[in-house]
C-alpha cells in the first residue's frame, strides 16, 4: 500500500477545540446553540460550526430548533478513537509509598503554592466518582512544570514503576470538566469524565476496562457529581 493510501486510511486525530466541543455535548442535558458552544470552549463561531458539521456527518450530533443535541454514546466512541491529550513534552513518572490520595493532595498543595492549575484523572478520579477498585496510579494534568520532589515524590523509570504520572498540557480545556460536571471531588480537582474514561483505556488492563465500562454508564445515566 502506498504512503498516500496509508495516510488517507489513518484515523485523523482531533484538535483541542474539537475534543472540547465533544466533551461539552456529552455533558449537556439539552441542546446548545452554536454561539453558546463557541463561547464555552473558546473557539470562533465559524470553527464551532465546522466541528458541529463534521460531528453531524458522523451521526454524533443532531440539529434541533433549539440548538445542537449531542448523541452521547457516539460522541464517546469518537472521543476514544480520535482524541489525544496535547502535551508540551513527554509525560513524567513519579513514585511514593504514601496512599494515592495523600500523594494527590500533596501535589495539589504544591501546585497551589506555584499557582499552577492541576487536575487529576485515572485511576484516582474515576474511583472517586464511581468506586471500582483500589487505585494504584493516577495521572495529573498540569499547565506548567512542577518540582514533584517537593511533594515527596521520587522519579520512577516508567509507567510500570510509577504511582503518579504527570502530564504538562497547554490545553486549558483539559484542566476542568465541562459543566454541569463537578470540577472537584473529595477536595481534589478532576478532569472531565470523558478524559478520565479515555485515560483508563490508555493506562490499560482488564480491570481498568471494566472500570471504564462503569464510568461510561455513569456518564450516560447522569449519576456523576454535578454542580446543578
Question: For the regions a protein language model found, what residue spans apply to each?
Answer:
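Short, cationic-aromatic polyanion-contact patches
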Residues: 9-18, 33, 66-85
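Short amphipathic alpha-helical interface segments
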Residues: 16-30
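Short acidic, hydrophobic short linear motifs in intrinsically disordered regions
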Residues: 30-40
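Key DNA-contact positions within bacterial/archaeal DNA-binding proteins
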Residues: 44-46
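A short, conserved structural fragment
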Residues: 56-66
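Short gly/ser-rich loop at a beta-strand->alpha-helix junction or flexible surface loop bordering the NTP-binding
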Residues: 87-173
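Hydrophobic alpha-helical interaction segments
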Residues: 147-228
Amino acid at each position: 500500500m502506498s504512503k498516500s493510501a496509508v495516510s488517507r486510511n489513518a484515523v485523523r486525530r482531533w484538535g483541542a477545540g474539537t475534543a472540547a466541543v465533544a466533551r461539552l455535548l456529552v455533558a449537556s442535558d439539552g441542546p446548545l446553540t452554536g454561539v453558546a458552544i463557541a463561547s464555552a470552549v473558546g473557539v470562533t463561531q465559524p470553527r464551532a460550526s465546522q466541528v458541529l458539521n463534521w460531528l453531524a456527518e458522523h451521526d454524533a450530533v443532531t440539529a434541533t430548533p433549539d440548538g445542537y443535541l449531542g448523541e452521547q454514546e457516539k460522541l464517546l466512541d469518537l472521543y476514544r478513537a480520535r482524541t489525544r491529550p496535547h502535551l508540551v513534552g513527554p509525560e513524567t513518572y513519579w513514585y511514593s509509598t504514601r496512599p494515592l490520595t495523600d500523594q494527590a493532595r500533596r501535589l495539589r498543595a504544591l501546585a497551589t503554592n506555584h499557582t499552577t492549575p492541576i487536575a487529576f484523572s485515572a485511576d484516582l478520579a474515576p474511583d472517586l466518582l464511581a468506586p471500582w477498585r483500589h487505585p494504584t496510579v493516577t495521572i495529573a494534568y498540569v499547565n506548567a512544570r512542577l518540582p514533584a520532589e517537593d511533594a515527596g515524590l521520587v522519579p520512577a523509570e516508567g509507567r510500570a514503576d510509577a504511582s503518579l504520572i504527570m502530564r504538562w498540557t497547554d490545553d486549558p480545556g483539559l484542566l476542568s470538566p465541562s459543566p454541569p460536571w463537578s470540577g472537584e471531588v473529595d477536595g481534589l480537582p478532576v478532569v472531565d469524565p470523558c478524559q478520565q474514561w479515555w485515560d483508563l483505556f490508555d493506562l490499560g488492563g482488564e480491570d481498568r476496562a471494566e472500570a471504564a465500562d462503569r464510568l461510561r454508564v455513569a456518564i450516560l445515566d447522569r449519576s456523576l457529581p454535578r454542580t446543578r
